[in-house]
Amino acid sequence: MAKKITGYIKLQVKAGEANPSPPVGPALGQRGVNIMEFCKAFNAQTQNVEKGLPLPVVITVYADRSFTFITKTPPASVLLKKALGLKSGSSKPNTDKVGTVTRAQLEEIAKMKMPDLTAADMDAAVRTIAGSATSMGLIVEGV
């Protein structure tokens, strides 16, 4: 018989840097999950990912206080900022442009994000990432 699910916890945790401090500790503690067990498992699973890259994680908590978790790919905005070497996007994306992104860069990011996107094909995924880039105040070339 399947375990009874008591809830889901969605967090963004930096790869290889999960520790019991906020936001991880309080979110897991109020559900009765063993915090250190999660931190060790998360850090072990993300050891091959670039350290410090924020990863969305969905933790499923069961009635017996056990858990499972699924890590997702980093947010598109983080990957775009990393690809262009930016600290942040534009505060006024419609008027102030902070950089230019090429189709090749968009395709590279779309390949990485493809498992988490609902896009039917690569072209749709590239357009999705291009939309994120435009919202950040980036000029999109070749789309």
Curated annotation (Swiss-Prot):
It comes from the Bacteria. Transmembrane segments: none annotated. GO terms for biological process: translation. One of its GO terms (molecular function) is large ribosomal subunit rRNA binding. SMART domains: RL11. Keywords: Methylation, Ribonucleoprotein, Ribosomal protein, RNA-binding, rRNA-binding. GO terms for cellular component: cytosolic large ribosomal subunit. One or more lysine residues are methylated. InterPro entries: Ribosomal_uL11, Ribosomal_uL11_bac-typ, Ribosomal_uL11_C, Ribosomal_uL11_C_sf, Ribosomal_uL11_CS, Ribosomal_uL11_N, Ribosomal_uL11_N_sf. Belongs to the universal ribosomal protein uL11 family. Forms part of the ribosomal stalk which helps the ribosome interact with GTP-bound translation factors. Part of the ribosomal stalk of the 50S ribosomal subunit. Interacts with L10 and the large rRNA to form the base of the stalk. L10 forms an elongated spine to which L12 dimers bind in a sequential fashion forming a multimeric L10(L12)X complex. This is Large ribosomal subunit protein uL11. It comes from Methylococcus capsulatus (strain ATCC 33009 / NCIMB 11132 / Bath). The lineage of its organism: Bacteria, Pseudomonadati, Pseudomonadota, Gammaproteobacteria, Methylococcales.
